[in-house]
Amino acid sequence: AVPAGTLSPLQMESLREVCEVNVACDEMADTAGIVAAYTXFYGPVP
């Protein structure tokens, strides 16, 4: 997985767009952060 500090704002926005359509992922992002939520539901950040 890619450490959160190495993602550009555009990459972070892309993760949010994927995650927000999944209610469970979106809720996890609110508490654990978008990178943690994305990796838990979709695997390593591309």
Curated annotation (Swiss-Prot):
GO terms for biological process: biomineral tissue development; bone development; cellular response to insulin stimulus; glucose homeostasis; negative regulation of bone development; osteoblast differentiation; regulation of bone mineralization; regulation of cellular response to insulin stimulus. Residues 1-43 form the Gla domain. The modification 4-carboxyglutamate is found at E13, E17, E20, E27. Ca(2+) 1 binds at E13. Keywords: Biomineralization, Calcium, Disulfide bond, Gamma-carboxyglutamic acid, Hormone, Metal-binding, Phosphoprotein, Secreted. One of its GO terms (cellular component) is extracellular region. Gamma-carboxyglutamate residues are formed by vitamin K dependent carboxylation by GGCX. These residues are essential for the binding of calcium. The modification Phosphothreonine is found at T6. It is found in: Secreted. Ca(2+) 3 binds at E20, D26. One of its GO terms (molecular function) is structural constituent of bone. Belongs to the osteocalcin/matrix Gla protein family. The carboxylated form is one of the main organic components of the bone matrix, which constitutes 1-2% of the total bone protein. The carboxylated form binds strongly to apatite and calcium. PANTHER family: OSTEOCALCIN. This is Osteocalcin 2. It comes from Solea senegalensis (Senegalese sole). The lineage of its organism: Eukaryota, Metazoa, Chordata, Craniata, Vertebrata.
